[in-house]
Curated annotation (Swiss-Prot):
Residues bound to K(+): D124
GO BP: coenzyme A biosynthetic process
Entry's Gene Ontology molecular function annotations: ATP binding; metal ion binding; pantothenate kinase activity
Name assigned to this protein: Type III pantothenate kinase
Cellular component annotations (GO), alphabetically ordered: cytoplasm
Subunit (UniProt): Homodimer.
Catalytic activity: (R)-pantothenate + ATP = (R)-4'-phosphopantothenate + ADP + H(+)
Length: 248
């Protein structure tokens, strides 16, 4: 069995994967709360002490928290954890930019779906909204825009008369009150941002792409984006599973 994990700015996912590369158990915890105690409590259900773990691989955009995870697994379970960007990724994917400046999760996403025939744009609704461009088997860079939830939380925190709201689809553009106006602004604003950036990428590269979407708000925008898209919620984890072949 193997362990793979995605340490994001907001959430951390840790998955137990069997020999057929199927996720059999997963835990999710808040990244900011990661410490020895929270990891010990969260991972009890995985029953790791009674399992043979061959490999452990994480992608992390929060180095301090990965270090805490690494120390925990080594101390409690005698398991050595690797970080994705420390592996020789050139065996799986060609990277045209300075990979040290690419989020580890974005590289995992790319590794998950890359092949020698298709071009992809991966749209990830995380703390930031990111677009990653893959042409054949090469990562060509991407776009980073403000995240939906981060932007919404910032607005409601800074504007005293705008209440906390749950973002959901709306058919109206013109809001009839504060809440519906904010919902319209975010829903149609991000829908326009997404379509525009995808079209600009196509124009700049003069190529066609398959669009993969993932992350927290992917379900909300799946049917409103004008371009045909495929939803892949576990793309990051699947990329990590694929990358474990690099661990000897």
């Amino acid at each position: 069995m193997i362990i793979v994990g995605d340490i994001g700015n907001t959430e951390t996912k840790i998955c137990l994967v069997n020999s057929k590369n199927i996720i059999i158990k997963r835990v999710i915890l808040l990244t900011k709360k990661i410490n020895h105690s929270s990891l010990n409590k969260s991972l009890l259900g995985l029953n790791l002490k009674n399992k043979s773990i061959n490999k452990c691989l994480f992608c992390s955009v929060v180095p301090k928290k990965f270090n805490a995870v690494k120390i925990f697994f080594k101390k409690v379970y005698k398991i050595k954890c690797h970080e994705l960007k420390k592996l020789n990724l050139n065996k799986l994917i060609k990277i045209k930019v300075n990979y040290k400046q690419i989020g580890s999760d974005r590289l995992a996403n790319a590794i998950s779906i890359i092949n020698n025939k298709d071009n992809f744009i991966i749209l990830d609704f995380g703390t930031a909204t990111t677009f990653d461009v893959l042409i054949k088997n090469t990562y060509h860079g991407g776009v980073i825009a403000p995240g939906v939830k981060l932007s919404l939380d910032t607005l409601t925190d800074k504007a005293s008369q705008i209440p906390k709201i749950n973002l959901k689809k709306t058919n109206r553009v013109i809001g009839l009150n504060t809440i519906s106006a904010v919902r319209a602004g975010f829903f149609w604003g991000y829908e326009g941002l997404i379509d525009n950036i995808v079209n600009l990428i196509k124009k700049e590269t003069k190529m066609s792409f398959k669009i993969i979407i993932t992350g927290g708000f992917s379900g909300l925008f799946k049917n409103s984006i004008k371009t045909k898209v495929t939803l892949n919620k576990d793309i990051t984890i699947k990329g990590l599973i694929r990358a474990t072949t690099l661990i000897k």
